[in-house]
Each structure stands twice: as structure tokens, then as C-alpha cells.
Amino acid sequence: MSRICEICGKGPSFGNNVSHANNKTSKIWRPNLQKIKAVKNGTVRSIKVCTRCIRSGHVTKAL
């Protein structure tokens, strides 16, 4: 569970790079994960959270 947000479960997306000659190579879009110290279930833990969850207030940072 290394590249998955622990709050919303967002993970990598898969697709293709497509050139003008219509050649396709595989591509991975990874979420912007940040390792932060947050309060979860009353305890302070270091968790990986995507920036959207941090920005929208789904997680409270520990002081």
C-alpha cells in the first residue's frame, strides 16, 4: 500500500503515451502523496495523504 492515499484510497492511474505516429507506450499517473504527521483515531501517526485530502481538510495535522 505504498502509493495509495490512506484517507481517500486514491492510487495510480494507468494509460498510454501516444505519439504523433500513434505509437503507444505505457504510462503511470501517480497521485501527489505527502508524508505528514496527522491525528488519526486519537493518536499521532505518520501517514501518506494526497494533497487534495490535505487541502480540503479531510485530515488534521498534528502540532
UniProtKB/Swiss-Prot annotation:
SUPFAM superfamilies: L28p-like. Keywords: Ribonucleoprotein, Ribosomal protein. InterPro entries: Bacterial_rp_bL28 (IPR050096), Ribosomal_bL28 (IPR026569), Ribosomal_bL28/bL31-like_sf (IPR034704), Ribosomal_bL28_bact-type (IPR001383), Ribosomal_bL28_sf (IPR037147). It holds the Pfam family Ribosomal_L28. Gene3D superfamilies: 2.20.150.30, Ribosomal protein L28/L24. It comes from the Bacteria. One of its GO terms (biological process) is translation. The keyword Ribosomal protein applies. The keyword Membrane does not apply. GO terms for molecular function: structural constituent of ribosome. GO terms for cellular component: ribonucleoprotein complex; ribosome. Belongs to the bacterial ribosomal protein bL28 family. This is Large ribosomal subunit protein bL28. It comes from Citrifermentans bemidjiense (strain ATCC BAA-1014 / DSM 16622 / JCM 12645 / Bem). The gene is rpmB.
